[in-house]
Amino acid sequence: MGRMWASEVLLLLLLGSSRAVTPGLDVSTAPGLDGSIPPGLDGSVSPGLDGSVSPGLDGSASPGLDGSVSPGLDGSASPGLDGSTPAGRDGTITPKLEGTITPKQDGSISPSWPWRWPITYLDAILAAVRLLNQKISGPCILRLREAQPRPGWVGTLQRRREVSFLVEDGPCPPGVDCRSCEPGALQHCVGTVSIEQQPTAELRCRPLRPQPIRNWWIRIWEWLNGIRKRLRQRSPFYVRGHLNVTSTPQP
């Protein structure tokens, strides 16, 4: 009786050890010859030894454990779950569908459209001087003498801004009759500049003459030259037109 009990216990131990040693079906996937791991039955891909995940058949890559997405073969990266796009290797940001530009890592913002570029006060005045030379009639070429700063230009959100500057008659070009020109004669121009998709300006200019000392010989000289002065005298004029604004290089 004791021997039969011992043999039954030994048989049970042998059966239990055989079940524990016998291997089941291996559901793990062995890597291929090139080191890549094919997807499992559910389409998921296990990460490699270095933690990287190979892209799928459509070229997309699943986010890593930290939520980051590696760029594709062309350097592009798919947007994240919140719609944002990570910065490229050079720090540039791809514009979104609505046209907005995200600042770069250094804080600067790339221009989206030319009419949204930052226009300085000097850029607007130089464009206004070019407009004057296009609109006025005569051989005289005006050039900028002084740009008078206007308060509220920097940081303002208004599209229409005030300008004030002085222009003078430049040297006479060779081969041109410039008898009606007075090199160095000043004119004071004021007006507004509209910063829009097509910038425009409304300017009013008037001659700026120095006030002479009222001595008797000055009065005689003015009387003798009165006719010549009246023939060459200029009247205030009004100019309105589109501006061709070009940004000046920043130092």
Swiss-Prot record:
The keyword Disulfide bond applies. Residues 29-109 are annotated as: Disordered. GO terms for cellular component: extracellular space; supramolecular fiber. Its main location: secreted. Residues 1-20 form the signal peptide. PANTHER family: CATHELICIDIN (PTHR10206), CATHELICIDIN B1-RELATED (PTHR10206:SF0). This is Cathelicidin-B1. It comes from Gallus gallus. The gene is CATHB1.
